[in-house]
A protein has these predicted regions:
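Subset of outer-membrane beta-barrel
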Residues: 24-475
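Bacterial Sec-dependent N-terminal signal peptides
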Residues: 1-27, 369
Length: 475
């Protein structure tokens, strides 16, 4: 039993550790009028001036989870810790503190180029960005099995997932006021896929009885890279099978046409951001509302390699072929055979070949409202609701803001949010005089860590910063 337990726990650790560091746009900047990039959260938002940035516009890194180390380590004795597996930890206390699905997600984004200017009675934006997202999902059943063991006769671990999407986008946006107070905006994004991978266990069930165990599983995986050249490995002039990577093409040929054809992206797509904002003006002085839908689109991968397991079962009815003259040797052979069966069950050897495949982006919705104080227009309070639509790695969040702008070129925001990943504190400082603009902030703050700087509670951390060159006067 310990062998199977530790095999499954090892799989859990691998999936959790596979999560990479990643980022998202700063929601803390949503209501700051001096921000040059809140149009990425709502295309209807108009920067106060034209602007330009190269490589320094925005850098953002974030990671979130709905669990932390405090879910698995418990105080014991005098200044000691023990794991959830200890008999001193009550199983109901441990399991009731866990969410049904343990989620971890992360995002990285950066603006390589940013440009904004007034045109045709509105405001036009152009940008090139890099985006990377990773999400993992683990069912609670894993830890229920590890803690309870034989107390239950069956366990289901279906719903294990690990996904990563990496792409570049070329963005063109436009916004304008259509009637007094009402502003609309749209951003079109041409997407270039860089890498994609998805691992999903849609069935993993364990049935246990006194005389045998039965494990049933099915898993799938898909993977694609930026470009995978279809070239004859010898002649280098036949664009048919077998395919070889672009790096090998560059090392074996100097023909410009061959290299250019090899460098064509293997994945392309299109997405749109939509936004609207309304200032109530004299109807309700100081009140404005806004809404946006982001990442409505998909990427088409030309060379997606797909794998799957066949529906498999592993049955273990005990160890009965023990040689009394070689107890340790024969026991090792039995356990080794069992381990090989489990390894085969989790391996994904069956390839369905390379084929075109479409992956949808995970859309995000924002609904916002802001009220400027009548006694001091540099002070406002606001609320923002956000939702990410995704099978795995989705979230809901409500965030309350206090925004302060004591001078035209200095503004700050402090906010508190409650989301799928718990309660968090965010902040943003924006310094934007005439010659340059600098901002730094965070949507998620880690408030408690171990002596080894490991977050104690939910792993919610984020940092974003950037420098932009303003152009022209405020308007």
């Amino acid at each position: 039993m310990k062998t199977i337990k530790y095999s499954l726990i090892t799989l859990v650790a691998f999936i959790l550790c596979a999560t990479n560091s990643n980022a998202q746009m700063a929601k803390s900047a949503y209501f700051l009028d001096g921000s040059f990039y809140n149009h990425q959260l709502n295309p209807a938002m108009k920067p106060e001036r034209a602007y330009f940035s190269l490589l320094t516009g925005t850098w953002s890194v974030a990671a979130n989870s709905n669990f932390g180390i405090s879910n698995f380590l418990y105080p014991y004795g005098d200044d000691k810790l023990t794991t959830f597996m200890s008999s001193h930890v009550d199983q109901d206390e441990f399991l009731n503190a866990l969410p049904n699905s343990l989620q971890m997600s992360s995002d990285i984004s950066t603006n390589l180029l940013g440009l904004g200017f007034r045109m045709f009675g509105g405001f036009t934006t152009f940008g090139i960005t890099l985006n990377s997202s990773v999400s993992t999902n683990l069912p609670k059943g894993f830890f229920e099995f590890a803690k309870k063991g034989f107390q239950e006769s069956s366990y289901s671990f279906s719903g294990i997932n690990m996904n990563t999407m990496n792409y570049a986008s070329i963005n063109l946006g436009y916004s304008r006021e259509v009637v007094e107070g009402l502003r609309v905006g749209v951003t079109a994004k041409y997407l270039v896929g860089l890498a994609y991978a998805n691992f999903n266990v849609d069935k993993l069930n364990i049935e246990m009885s006194e005389d045998k165990w039965m494990i049933e599983s099915h898993a799938t995986a898909e993977a694609a890279l930026y470009t995978e050249m279809s070239v004859d490995a010898g002649a280098m002039d036949d664009l048919n099978e077998p395919r070889i990577p672009l790096a090998d093409v560059l090392s074996n040929t100097t023909d410009v046409n061959t290299i250019m054809q090899a460098a064509k992206p293997a994945a392309k797509g299109l997405a749109f951001d939509l936004g609207v904002s309304y200032d109530f003006g004299d109807l309700v002085d100081g009140l404005s509302v806004s809404a946006s839908l982001l990442d409505l689109g998909s990427i088409n991968w030309q060379y997606m390699t797909k794998f799957s397991t066949e529906d498999g079962k592993v049955e273990f009815d005990g160890i009965d072929e023990i040689d009394p003259n070689d107890f340790e040797g024969s026991l090792d052979k039995e356990l080794e055979a069992l381990g090989e069966d489990i390894e085969k069950m989790f391996s994904i050897p069956y390839s369905h070949g390379t084929q075109a495949y479409r992956t949808k982006l995970s859309p995000v919705m924002y609904l916002g409202a802001e009220y400027n104080m009548p006694f001091y227009h540099g002070l406002s309070v606001a609320m923002l609701y956000g939702k990410r639509f995704a099978t795995y790695g989705g979230w809901d969040e409500v965030r309350g803001y206090v925004n302060l702008a004591p001078l035209k070129w200095i503004e700050a925001s402090a906010n508190v949010g409650y989301s799928t990943y718990g309660t968090t504190f965010g902040w943003m400082f924006n310094f934007h005089p005439r010659l340059f603009s600098f901002f730094i902030g965070s949507d998620y703050m880690v408030t408690k860590v171990t002596p080894q700087y490991i977050p104690v509670n939910n792993i919610n951390g984020h940092i974003t910063f950037g420098i932009t060159k303003p152009i022209g006067k405020r308007k």
